[in-house]
Design a protein with these regions (language model features):
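Predominantly late transmembrane helices and immediately cytosolic-facing juxtamembrane segments
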Residues: 2-27, 31, 36, 42, ...
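Short acidic, Gly/Ser-rich segments with clustered Asp/Glu that frequently serve as metal-coordination loops
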Residues: 37-38, 49
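Short, hydrophobic transmembrane alpha-helix segments
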Residues: 45-59, 83, 112-113, 364
């Protein structure tokens, strides 16, 4: 009986999932995929950390953005596909495992990208992941007649763009920033084109949960990275107040960013049409700002202990830029067009203040701590004002 059940699971039709399925949650396989992906994100963060303290920031940042996009885009494709078609059969699990192997190959190639601008290994890993995904879309074309054209559009689009990556890297053309940008735009265009025919049945609540989980994972990885740098620095000399302020400030920043993200509902941005694309694509700035902030805080420890070749002021502006990018996304999607009065402008005002703080403090520890206090004050003021408005509405209604 159990053998027959296993055989049925192996041969299960690759039918679409119900987008209104109750209590849809992330699967253990999806969580494993996320955790493996953190290895690649952590590797990229370590490379950026070392580049920052060696004063190679402007050379390393574009490279980091390129690497992070490749990682994030592979995660994006897997996540949205799984939301619509994860049937957890044997072949699906095996193809997901192939994608996991591809992500590990990508992680192995990250140091060469930073040190030699060599994308060979990372693109090989990318090809492994994409071939597995194309196979999944071909399965969809076979088992979901309603969206067969959509599935073929995805499969063909992915193959064509992947050929562009291969030609751009392994031919005489070479991978230039302009070519990279063109290929990125092509990658982003594939889902827009494919979904025009028939929208895949992704699950709104499941997608929101998947994005939230990755946000927590990237936050956690950033905290671990900065903590490891702090632990190493503190083991080599006596701790002073400046470094204590730096550690407290870094933790407060991460806590405030977590609070800001999870203090609001993301589900109303999951309506059909173009808005889910803006919401989903826009999260790139959420994830990369958190990841860069983690590397920056780790580098800030080296600045504080005088083991870096970058100034406290420059480090402060890098950290302010991370908070600004993160806050701008939150502001545009949740406050700029939904709030009225002065509360609408709390984020822009906070961002301006953050960029001025490095002008008034000479040590990175104080800079980080004051930035964290300012960011938390914005959160407190917004919460107090909101609660006050809610109390007034309740009093008026009674």
């Amino acid at each position: 009986m159990s053998a027959e059940k296993n055989q049925n699971k192996t041969r299960k039709l690759f039918a679409p999932r119900d987008p209104e399925e109750a209590q849809r949650a992330a699967t253990p396989l999806e969580l494993l995929f996320d955790l493996i992906f953190v290895v690649a994100i952590a590797t990229a963060g370590q490379q950026l950390h070392h580049a920052i303290i060696e004063a190679h920031l402007w050379h390393a940042l574009p490279t980091y953005v390129m690497v992070f996009f490749a990682l994030w885009w592979a995660w994006m494709n897997f996540t949205w596909f799984a939301s619509a078609y994860d049937n957890d059969d044997t072949l699906y699990r095996c193809l997901t495992f192939v994608q996991i192997v591809g992500s590990l190959v990508m992680a192995a190639g990250i140091p060469a990208v930073f040190q030699e601008h060599n994308f060979d290994v990372i693109i090989i890993g990318y090809v492994i992941m994409r071939l597995a995904l194309v196979t999944q879309w071909i399965r969809v074309a076979k088992h979901d007649p309603e969206r067969r054209v959509t599935a073929y559009r995805y499969a063909v689009g992915i193959v064509l763009v992947q050929l562009g990556w291969l030609i751009g890297n392994f031919s005489a053309i070479h991978m230039t920033p302009l070519l990279f940008l063109i290929l990125v735009l092509a990658e982003l265009a594939v889902p827009l084109y494919a979904e025009k025919y028939a929208v895949t049945p992704w699950h709104p609540h499941h997608i929101v949960e998947r994005y939230a989980l990755l946000t927590i994972i990237v936050l956690g990885e950033s905290i671990i990275g900065s903590f490891a740098a702090t632990q190493e620095a503190f083991s080599n000399h006596d701790v002073n107040f400046k470094e204590i302020f730096l550690v407290i400030g870094g933790l407060l920043m991460m806590f405030a960013m977590w609070w800001v993200y999870f203090d609001r509902s993301h589900h109303h941005h999951q309506r059909r049409g173009v808005q889910p694309f803006l919401w989903g694509y826009g999260h790139f700035f959420i994830f990369i700002s958190i990841a860069v902030l983690g590397a920056a805080l780790a580098a800030a420890v080296d600045v504080s202990t005088q083991h870096a070749h970058i100034s406290s002021q420059m480090m402060g502006w890098l950290i302010a830029a991370c908070l600004a990018i993160y806050s701008t996304y939150i502001w545009l999607f949740y406050e700029a067009f939904d709030l009225s009065g002065w509360r609408r402008w709390l984020y822009p005002i906070t961002i301006l203040i953050l960029f001025t703080i490095p002008l008034f403090f000479a040590d990175i520890g104080y800079i980080v701590f004051v930035m964290a206090v300012v960011y938390i004050l914005r959160l407190v003021i917004a919460k107090l004002y909101l609660n006050n408005c809610n109390d007034k509405r309740m009093a008026a209604s009674t």
